[in-house]
C-alpha cells in the first residue's frame, strides 16, 4: 500500500513518479535493511521538492505536523507503523502522553495532533495530551476547526516521572510533538 496524501493535484503521473512507484519494493527493502542496522527516530517527516525530473529533501522535522494530511484509508498502515515503533521502544506500553505545541501559528497543527492521537489509540494505547505551559493549570478543552475537541492537561513532575491527573495517569512513553 502506497501512502497517499490529500492533495488538489490531479492528472497523469509524471515519468519520475511512475519510476518511483515501480521501484517501491526496492525502496521499501532498502529502508528495512537500513533500519535493521540503525535505529531511526520514533517519527520524523521530510519535506521533498519534486522538480519533475528529480526529488530532493529540503527539510527534515523531528516533530512532524502533517498527520492531518493522511487519507482515511492510510490509518491501518499508519497504525501498523506506530505499533512497530512502539514495540521497539516500550514493548509493554499501555499509556502514552503526547506533548503538543500550544502556540503554533499553523491553524491545522492541532488537527494534526488529533490525528496523531487517533493513530496511537488505534494501536491500543491510552492516549492523553500534556503540557508544561504555565497557562495550562487544569484540563483544558480546545475546539478544532473541524468540530473535534482536544483536552490538554498540565504535566506534573512526580520525582523523575511526568504524569497526569495527580499521578493517576503514569505513561511508559512520552511523545514530543513540540520543539520545546
Regions found by a protein language model. Give the residues of each.
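Preference for protein termini
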Residues: 1-180
Amino acid at each position: 500500500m502506497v501512502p497517499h496524501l490529500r492533495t488538489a493535484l490531479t492528472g497523469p503521473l509524471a515519468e519520475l513518479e511512475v519510476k518511483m512507484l515501480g521501484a517501491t519494493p526496492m525502496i521499501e527493502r532498502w529502508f528495512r535493511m537500513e533500519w535493521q542496522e540503525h535505529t531511526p527516530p520514533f517519527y520524523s517527516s521530510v519535506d521533498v521538492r519534486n522538480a519533475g525530473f528529480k526529488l530532493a529533501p529540503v527539510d527534515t522535522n523531528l516533530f512532524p505536523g502533517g498527520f492531518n494530511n493522511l487519507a482515511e484509508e492510510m490509518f491501518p498502515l499508519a497504525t501498523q507503523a506506530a505499533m512497530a515503533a512502539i514495540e521497539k521502544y516500550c514493548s509493554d506500553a499501555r499509556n502514552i502522553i503526547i506533548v503538543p505545541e500550544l502556540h503554533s501559528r499553523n491553524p491545522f497543527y492541532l488537527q494534526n495532533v488529533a490525528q496523531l492521537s487517533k493513530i496511537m489509540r488505534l494501536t491500543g494505547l491510552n492516549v492523553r495530551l500534556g503540557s508544561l505551559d504555565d497557562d495550562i493549570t487544569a484540563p483544558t478543552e480546545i475546539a478544532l476547526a473541524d468540530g473535534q475537541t482536544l483536552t490538554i492537561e498540565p504535566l506534573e513532575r512526580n520525582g523523575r516521572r511526568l504524569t497526569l491527573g495527580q499521578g493517576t495517569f503514569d505513561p511508559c512513553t512520552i511523545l514530543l510533538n513540540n520543539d520545546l
